[in-house]
Amino acid sequence: MAGHSKFKNIQHRKGAQDKKRAKVFTKLIREIVTAVKAGSTNPDNNPRLRTALATARSQNLPKERIDKAINSANDSANNENYTEIRYEGYAPGGIAIIVEALTDNKNRTAAEVRSSFTKYGGNLGETGSVNFLFKHCGVIQYPLEISSAENILETAIEAGTDDIVSDEVLHTIYTDIENFSKVLEFLTDKYGTAEEAYIGWVPLNTIIIDDKEKAEKLLKLVDLLEESDDVQRVFGNYELSDEIYEILQGSDE
């Protein structure tokens, strides 16, 4: 698929994500609870729960916390109810941003997201204002050393998809949303737990960020959005240039 953000963006984000592990776990649990309430506790007949569990395992959410979340959601006394919302807008430089949220207070979440965009010079638009610049699909990633690109492609084809990109550190497999769980299960049996596995928005084309100030501003916006407990994931159609990536990596050390 054209335009997927390359490994350097993923690697630069990973350090920040590791520091937010507790918050990431909280968001994964919220998705599991929502999936159970929307369907059942059986992932075999609840595709959303099956996807939520796959994502949680790829992020190393402990099994006891997964089980606790499922049991809690199935408890009639549990009054947690979250609504799915998607926000779309532009960061400075015409970078398209999609924000997926699960919230129990739409007004609060909308205010937080709008404030984040405004603080860093972006503009929150209407739903549908940028999603045409992305493909909504499943994303599964394995480290490069897990196998050769040829073997990964062969396995992916067996699993039901031939959309794979291998770069300097990652194999990325893309799937239709309907086949995501099946493909992930097949790959997991062959290669073990994926480094990343989720349904998200992959840019059809990317804008190269080759200015340090613009890159820092953009990443601060993404970080601020991700700090919200209600925000599940943030997607953008940008890619850091090699030079800017190296500069930012150096400033993080």
Curated annotation (Swiss-Prot):
An annotated GO BP = regulation of DNA-templated transcription
Query: Chief localization class?
Result: cytoplasm
Q: List the disulfide bonds.
A: none
The answer on whether this UniProt entry bears the keyword DNA-binding reads yes
In alphabetical order, the GO MF annotations are: DNA binding
For whether the record's keyword set contains Glycoprotein, the answer is: no
Short name of one Pfam family: Transcrip_reg
UniProt keyword terms in alphabetical order: Cytoplasm, DNA-binding, Transcription, Transcription regulation
NCBIfam families per the record? PRK00110.1, PRK12378.1, YebC/PmpR family DNA-binding transcriptional regulator
Protein family per UniProt: Belongs to the TACO1 family.
Q: What is this protein called?
A: Probable transcriptional regulatory protein RBE_0568
This chain's source organism reads: Rickettsia bellii (strain RML369-C)
